[in-house]
A protein has these predicted regions:
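Feature marks short, highly hydrophobic, charge-poor N-terminal signal-anchor/signal peptide-like helices
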Residues: 1-10
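Generic low-complexity segments that are intrinsically disordered, proline-rich and/or Lys/Arg-biased
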Residues: 4, 40, 55, 101-104
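Terminal, regulation- and interaction-focused segments at domain boundaries
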Residues: 14-71
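A generic structural signal for short, non-catalytic loop/turn and secondary-structure boundary residues
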Residues: 42, 78, 105-107
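Residues that act as N-cap/strand-start positions at coil-to-secondary-structure junctions
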Residues: 43-45, 79, 90
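Extracytoplasmic/periplasmic/luminal assembly and interaction segments
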Residues: 61-88
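Cytosol-/stroma-facing membrane-proximal "stalk/adaptor" domains immediately downstream
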Residues: 83-169
Length: 169
């Protein structure tokens, strides 16, 4: 009878933790503050933004650093035309890159590309916390663009080359 009680306690604890995490995620989603509902494979897409925002410095200042920090995400400018998003647990790396200007597309129009460069998986499947972190980072980028340019346009294209970091435990 003893092992059954231990198993029941472990299962009950797992269910309680799962419900608490789901409740926290639902509150974040309903508030719209941290992340948005997206397709399950959104992290395999390249997100391109067409905007009048002229440089990454303005965008970096418009990012919601508080929400990113609460989710353990840091943003660094590692190059003049690139921001790197990483989480504290090394579950993903994403970049926002300013693309070269193309005068044929119009004066004052800039393009930026958000891509996930690496994501941690477990048994070949992306871990939920990595997907959540990527979603939070992408939502912060979208909100920053819309804050600076209400007419910013986003497009998504599936990528064929993205890397995972496999974990067995």
């Amino acid at each position: 009878m003893g092992p059954f009680i231990v198993i029941a306690v472990v299962v009950a604890a797992g269910v309680i933790v799962g419900l608490l995490v789901a409740n926290k995620n639902n509150k974040l989603f309903e508030s719209g503050a941290a992340y948005r509902n997206r397709p399950a494979d959104f992290y395999t897409q390249m997100h391109t933004f067409r905007t009048t925002v002229p440089n990454l410095e303005l965008l970096l200042n418009a990012l919601d650093g508080r929400t990113l920090a609460q989710q353990g995400i840091t943003v660094i400018r590692d190059h003049a035309d690139r921001l790197v998003f990483r989480d504290a647990m090394d579950r993903f790396t994403a970049t926002l890159t300013a693309l070269p200007e193309d005068p044929s597309l119009g004066e004052g129009i800039s393009f930026y590309r958000f891509t996930v460069n690496r994501v941690k998986t477990k048994n070949g499947t992306i871990i939920l916390s990595a997907r959540m972190g990527i979603n939070v980072a992408l939502t912060a980028v979208e909100k920053a663009f819309l804050t600076l340019d209400f007419n910013a346009v986003a497009q998504r294209v599936y990528m064929t080359d993205w890397k995972t970091k496999t974990s067995f435990f």
